[in-house]
Amino acid sequence: MSSSIKTKVAISLGIMYVAWGTTYIGIAFTIETMPPLLSMSFRFVAASIALFVFIGIRSGWASLRLTRNEFVSANFLGVLMLGMGLGTMALAEKVVPIGVASLIVAAMPIWTALFRTLDKDRPTISSLLGITAGLIGIAIIMLPGQTIARPDSGDQNVTLWMFIILLGNLCWSLGSFLAPRMQTPSNPLVLSTYEMAGAAGALFIAGMINQESISDFMDASVRSWGGWIYLVTVGSLIGYTVYTWLLENAPITLVSTYAYVNPVVAVALGIVIFNETLTTNILLGGFIVIVSVAVVVAVESAKKQSLSQAQ
């Protein structure tokens, strides 16, 4: 890797860490006065249209044509990963502190590794130890009565909403497991475009069922609009574009570090911006989760590289 590429990779990693680590703050600002599900739906409408136009101009409109199987698979993955994963997050961040939410989501590589056992892809001893420790860390974070809900959450059960975030995270992990086994577009940006479109439709329907109002979205505060625009531009467009570039130009072990760097960014911002309190169980459980994820990501990435070299 040349020095110029190394510099670009380092800058891109920094952008990805900031873009995705700060999305939790963006969501928190957005849902202050915007309906959670509709705001996420319209976020993906805007982002998918922008990506569609960008890809069409850069690579030609023919590159956006999909087979029926590719179209169905991309939309299904969008509903499962973005719709369920970020839809539940938008609902839950009304109650669950941002730092706690990010630490629960950080465990995604652990769930993905567990799903792969269904495909007779047995984890190594190191992975198994990391997975076990990660599950213990999640359990410590989610101990009932140990996490203080956000001030404006009313009397809602914070533990219940942590489990809802966990459900969304499991859906995202299941999608990550299924994606390589499905017929999807080869261009990751094209795949992201159709995933966002599928998620937008599902979240809009869910928002209507949840009796959310489009007028509430339009009449939101300046801060909520700022958060929403940030999610569209930085979280979706810049984040995904940088991520796909890194996948093509950097080792997967390096790219995968976002899984345990992002929650550190989110926890720090939660303390600075929202004065969130880190209890002992959050500190201990969070530390265990981040270390466990680092182990699992490193081991699984090394296994993938050795398999690709063997082939």
Region annotations inferred by a language model:
Residues 11, 15, 41-46, 72, ...:
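Hydrophobic residues within alpha-helical transmembrane segments
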Residues 19, 23-24, 52-105, 140, ...:
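Specific transmembrane alpha-helical segments of multi-pass solute transporters/efflux pumps
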Residues 1-15, 49-77, 120-129, 146-160, ...:
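Membrane-interface interhelical linkers
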Residues 31-84, 109-115, 170-178, 192-212, ...:
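Transmembrane alpha-helices of multi-pass small-molecule transport proteins
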Residues 51, 107, 123-148, 260, ...:
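Hydrophobic transmembrane alpha-helices of multi-pass small-molecule transport proteins
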Residues 40-42, 82, 86, 100-107, ...:
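Helix-helix packing/entry segments at the starts of transmembrane helices
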Residues 35-49, 91-108, 158-170, 223-233:
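Structural signature of hydrophobic alpha-helical transmembrane segments
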Residues 31-32, 93, 120, 183, ...:
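Helix-capping/transition residues at the boundaries of transmembrane alpha-helices
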